[in-house]
Structures are given as C-alpha cells and as structure tokens.
Amino acid sequence: MTTRLVIIGGGPGGNTAATWAARLGAEVTIIERDIMGGAAHLLDCIPSKAMIATGGAVSATKRFAGMGLEQHVAEIDVDNLAERIDGIRTRLENTTTQLLDSQGIRM
C-alpha cells in the first residue's frame, strides 16, 4: 500500500517535507495558493535583500574618494532594480518547481 501525503503550503517547510516524503516513497501533492517557493520568501525576503545590496553598493561608492579614487554619482535605476528582483524571483520559483517535479511531487 502506498502512502499518500498532501502538504498545504509550498514554502521552504512544505518543500522540505515533500522532498523527504517523496524520498521515503510516498505519493506527495503540494497545495500552494500563491507562489511555489513561499510568498513571504519570494515577495519579501528576496526583494528586500536585493534592495539592501543595491543601497550598500551606492554607499560604498561614497567611500571611494577617501581611498584616492575618483568619485562618480551613483543613481539607482528603480526600473532596472525591479526587473532584477523579478528575474531572481522567477528563477527561484522555476528552480523549486523543477526540483519538486523531478522527484515526482504533484503541485
């Protein structure tokens, strides 16, 4: 008899549970209402870290003058930053989906 398992939530916890259950031979289905990989992770954590990194890079350029380097004004291209964040989010969601699919986990 095959063990069947339904996991509600496709975030990091649900994905880990699904992966382990599949490795142990269970038929696994993940139910996710939003974004596979976790809405909080992909909509909050990733974008905020990308924005922090960009701000840090701008801040670092302000210290260049003290190191004998010519300083140029760095401006944040908000549209470019948003596109970068969206690309990261899409790649992570696709990678998560492909990994789960490769293990026979239904979504």
Question: Where are the regions that the model predicts?
Answer:
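Beta1/beta-strand and adjacent pyrophosphate-binding region of the FAD-binding site
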Residues: M1-G13
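Glycine-rich flavin
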Residues: T2, T19-A26, I31-M107
